[in-house]
Regions:
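Cyclophilin-like peptidyl-prolyl cis-trans isomerases
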Residues: 2-223
Length: 223
């Protein structure tokens, strides 16, 4: 397992590079969309997703399950009181079946797993981007990037997140205030551990060959 210093170095490199989460796939660098590829999820028309005024997912705490083929199911709590745009976007994409059959394309043991890219390489996203709900982008967000946190990948553009997300295996405080954390795993974190421990990666950026990428069977909104 990599040390925290290594993870931090990768994260900073991704942020500067093109995303950790794009960091090859995340959507942003650190998890920049995690890697150099931060995906820069810019909708086709360049517009940002805005929840409807009566959107039930834009307030309160919601719950969803993330089922990964061959690994099991994670249960997550999503806090729209902190990140209403992010939670609304995620829940609606899940309800549409957007995530079903997509993969985790970037995996860094001791750091995080990143997925939700229809291209499977950190460069794709949904039709629209969302505003980055984190402090360096002018939005208060007190959810820390600790073990089990779910957060959005992005590119260097603070408003470039779209569909790619990452789940923390270990704490990475340097991501706080720079990425839109919007919930946490409440059950099944061992799924993340199993993925990190068993999936072979191609490089230090956590790139996973297409044939080895864990498949998201379904993301289902519970309430």
């Amino acid at each position: 397992m990599r040390t925290f210093d290594r993870r931090e170095a990768l994260g900073l490199a991704a942020l500067l590079g093109t995303s950790l989460l794009t960091l090859s796939g995340c959507e942003s660098g650190e998890p920049t969309a995690a890697d150099s590829s931060a995906p820069s999820d810019e909708g086709e028309d360049g517009s940002l997703y805005v929840p409807a005024e009566d959107d039930p997912y834009a307030t309160g705490v919601h719950h969803a399950t993330i089922e990964v083929e061959g690994y099991g199911t994670m249960e997550v709590a999503l806090n729209a009181n902190v990140a209403p745009i992010t939670v609304s976007n995620f829940c609606h994409l899940a309800e549409e079946g957007f995530y079903d059959g997509l993969t985790f394309h970037r995996i860094i043991e001791g750091f995080m797993i990143q997925g939700g890219d229809p291209q499977g390489n950190g460069t794709g996203g949904a039709e629209k981007n969302i505003k980055g709900e984190f402090s360096s982008n002018g939005v208060e967000n007190n959810i820390p990037h600790v073990r089990g946190t779910i957060s959005m990948a992005r590119s260097q553009d603070p408003d470039s997140a779209s569909s790619q997300f990452f789940i923390m295996q270990e704490t990475a405080e340097h991501l706080d205030g720079e990425y839109a954390a919007f919930g946490n795993v409440t059950s099944g974190i061992e799924v993340v551990d199993a993925i990190c421990e068993s999936v072979p990666v191609e490089d230090s950026n956590g790139t996973v060959a297409a044939e080895n990428q864990p498949v998201i069977a379904a993301i289902s909104v519970v309430d």
